[in-house]
Each structure stands twice: as C-alpha cells, then as structure tokens.
Amino acid sequence: MKSKHIKPLLAASLFSLAPMATIAAATPDLAAQAAAEYRTMARYPEWSQPVSGALADPLLAGREATVQTQAGPAGAGPALSVWASDIRYSTGDTAYFYASLAERTASSVNLLAPAPRSAAGPWAVTGELVDNNGQQLAMLSYRDDGKDGDQQAGDGVYTASYVLPATHQPDIGSAKNIAIKVTAVNADQDQRVALGGFLYSQPGAQLTGEYRDRLSEGSLVIAAKVDVAVAGRYHLAGVLASALGESLSLSQNAVHLEPGSHWVDLSFYGLILREAGVSGPYTLSSVTLTTAGAMPNALGPVVTAAHVTKPYLNVQFTDKPFARADLLDAATRLEGLVKR
C-alpha cells in the first residue's frame, strides 16, 4: 500500500499591483512577515496541522451548503434564496431542498436607481433536477405546510425532498454534478428563478466504523478500517478533538488501495498535542473518506464522534518541531530580502 501525504497550499503572492516605490518600501515588512509565518508552519508536517479550538471543525465547515440568492428583474424584490441539506448525496439518500423569498437588504439596493416594484406572494415553488448531461431527473414541488420534511408550516421556508435513485447513479468510484433550477411564481405570474446543486457521489470505498489507536514515534496514530470495492486513490481526513470537544488537529493521508479490507492511518503530530496542553482520551470528532481518482471527486459522508482513544498523557508526545525543509528554505530566502 503506497502512501503519499497531501501538501497544503502555500501562502499567496507577496506582492500586489502597486507603484514600484510602494512595493520597494513594503517588501521588507511583507517578506519578514511571510518568513515568520513559514517558520511557524514548518513546526508541523504537511499531513498534520493544528486547528484552533475556537474555530469550527474544518471538515464539517467544508461541507456546509451554500445559499444561492437571485433577485427579480432589475433587482426587484423579493429575492429567491435556495440551498440543500448537504453538498453530496449517494444512492438511497433523501436530499432535502429549501427555498425562501425575502426583500433585499439596504446594502444590496442601488439607491440611485428607481425602485422596481416588489412582487407579493403567495408563491408556488417548484424545482427541476438536471444532471451534467442536461437530462431531467425529476420535477419537485416545494411545500410550507409542516409536512414531508418541512419543519414548520407557514415560516416562509419551502421544502422539497428527493430520494436519490439507482437509475441515475454515477459509476462506482465516481461522482457527477446535479443542478436544481428553482422557480417561484405568484398569482400575478411574477417569477423568481435561482440555481442550486449538489454532488451525486458513489464512492469506491467505505469506512467500516472500526478504528484503533496507538502511540508511534511521539505522535498519535488512529487507523481506520475501510472496505474497498474498486482499486484507486483514496483520501482519508480526520479532526482530533479534546474530551471537551475543542478541535486540536487535522490529519490527512492519501493512499492507493486495491479491492478488499485495509487499515489506513491518520497521524496527528505529537507536538500539536504537547503544545495544546491537553491529555486524552481524545475523540476523532470527524472523519471522511474520499475517492480521488477523477474529477469531481466522489465524496464520502462525514462521520462524527467516530472514535475515542486511550487516555494518553500529553507529555507522552514529542516536543520536537517537525522542521519542514521546504518551508524553512523559503523562509531563509525571504529573510534574505529583508537584509538587502
């Protein structure tokens, strides 16, 4: 089993478009700041990074659905907003789609332009599901009556649901984008249209729910058992949290796997846990397995509260920085700019 850790993106370019004199004056400060950031980043390996406990779980945050909003002609209100309950679904999953209509905020209105007429409800809301080949999968009717997945009658949030069928599923180990065109129409035939979407994902491997942990070379390693249906490249990512639920570290690992059952390691670098000053037991608060052989990647679900480790003491973990050579070299080059 070959393993290749994922490289994070490096910092953005140091320079913006500005007069040369301004760039020359700003270069030492920007270079020094970037060099310091690189030296801080170099303390940890590319495959295990610290996460501030004050921030949301990065895996869960990355799966939050985006709200798409579209106003009427010439910016007329109300604007139609649409979103889904998740960004990915697999065969047999029930997808929930939501829509609401609301007047534009003051910040989104052009005060110099004549105010267009605002349309009034009630509204009939429908959705058309279309795959990436333009084939219609279904027509959906949204409701706001507190039934069939709609949480509260009359709250202005319209809901539709759809069970992902096997007849339209992508090949195993792949995924395809599905668009949903949402249309709201009132009695005056005023119309609002907005586009949303999701990923119809059919991963080539699944997490089994079995995990085990160990201390290895001063770091915490959690192994996840996976069942692989098709050979390919897979990406495992997980977030480690304290017993109080504070996120501590994000670890990721990319591996090529053949069909069958395998254990895949997530290594959380010990210095992160040492510096956090928090002892175990720790919780694998979120974990997900992605099939990464083709675009778009076939995302797997994010499993929460997946595993609780043994009660390790934080002093059992290494206190040595990882000293990433690529980042230290970059920092040295930037510091050379400051000395000129």
Tell me the role of every PLM-derived stretch.
Residues 57-79, 195-203:
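Proline/serine/threonine-rich low-complexity linkers at boundaries of modular beta-sandwich domains
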Residues 186-215, 293-340:
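Short beta-strand elements
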Residues 146-167, 258-273:
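Aromatic sugar-binding surface patches on proteins
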Residues 103-141, 234-249, 286-291:
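Extended low-complexity, serine/threonine- and proline-enriched intrinsically disordered segments
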